[in-house]
Amino acid sequence: MSENAANNIMETKICTDAIVSELQKKKVHLFYCLECEELARNIAAESDHITLQSINWRSFADGFPNLFINNAHDIRGQHVAFLASFSSPAVIFEQISVIYLLPRLFVASFTLVLPFFPTGSFERMEEEGDVATAFTMARIVSNIPISRGGPTSVVIYDIHALQERFYFADQVLPLFETGIPLLTKRLQQLPETEKVIVAFPDDGAWKRFHKLLDHYPTVVCTKVREGDKRIVRLKEGNPAGCHVVIVDDLVQSGGTLIECQKVLAAHGAVKVSAYVTHGVFPKSSWERFTHKKNGLEEAFAYFWITDSCPQTVKAIGNKAPFEVLSLAGSIADALQI
């Protein structure tokens, strides 16, 4: 057999395998909450096997939800998913009402995509009487009814504390994904002249992410108590002469990131950037980081977040130094598992 003939056979096999793989993908009907409409459309744009479906989100005069799932008969025997955003207690009840019903509509399988698990930072009971709402939320999600295909799959990105994966009961199948591949892809697009190293603002962030970023040199910061204050200090590593990227799972007020940036700059970092999967930013605290004359002008070269918190993405727009790295492609892939 000639070399050209062998190459043609190999190319034909590769094409055939690709076609078979594409045909084996399941068709998914994706419902979504109002906040997540843009992300849902981006997910559908990633795959021809994802079809968007709609829900009528209305309220009665007393404020309680008046909901209707369109095409309820058409999704029987189909793979169904729901894209949720538990951005506030006010919207959780209406979404849970839909989430509990969809698996009961005789669907082949049901997947809940909850990019941000909102109560994840409230997982500890430091004294008797503390309420660990992370466990409460996990119990609510764990009680989703099974579908004809079995337990519900729950897709969550970068849950705050690693032990929270054990909060979910056996009635659901949690799939814990991460946004770190989006960061590494973006870092590869930076100029080759920049020496990039990764900084973790505390030991918790190091535990969560260091294995995913072990091909980068690292710096670890820590918080130490001085009187009534908690001061950020450099624990290990040398940021001098480098573009340092602070990595964490979420940001609220941003105080820790700002203090960490000051410490890194004081130790000789040429640039400081930040990445968090979940830009929560309550009370518009993201404004502290925008490039303007407020004492923090361009303190951060880049601030990367994902679109796991749609309200934040909408508020920030394209304001520097923020860049949004979309989870759409990753979610589309997760829906095929």
Curated annotation (Swiss-Prot):
Name under which the protein is recorded: Ribose-phosphate pyrophosphokinase 4
Annotated source species: Arabidopsis thaliana
Family: Belongs to the ribose-phosphate pyrophosphokinase family.
GO biological process: nucleotide biosynthetic process
Binding of phosphoribosylpyrophosphate: region residues: 241-256
GO CC, alphabetical: cytoplasm; cytosol; plasma membrane; plasmodesma
Residue(s) carrying N-acetylserine: S2
EC numbers on record: 2.7.6.1
PANTHER family for this protein: RIBOSE-PHOSPHATE DIPHOSPHOKINASE FAMILY MEMBER, RIBOSE-PHOSPHATE PYROPHOSPHOKINASE 4
Keywords: Acetylation, ATP-binding, Kinase, Magnesium, Metal-binding, Nucleotide biosynthesis, Nucleotide-binding, Transferase
Taxon lineage: Eukaryota, Viridiplantae, Streptophyta, Embryophyta, Tracheophyta
Amino acids binding Mg(2+): D158, H160
Gene Ontology terms for molecular function: ATP binding; kinase activity; magnesium ion binding; ribose phosphate diphosphokinase activity
Catalytic activity: D-ribose 5-phosphate + ATP = 5-phospho-alpha-D-ribose 1-diphosphate + AMP + H(+)
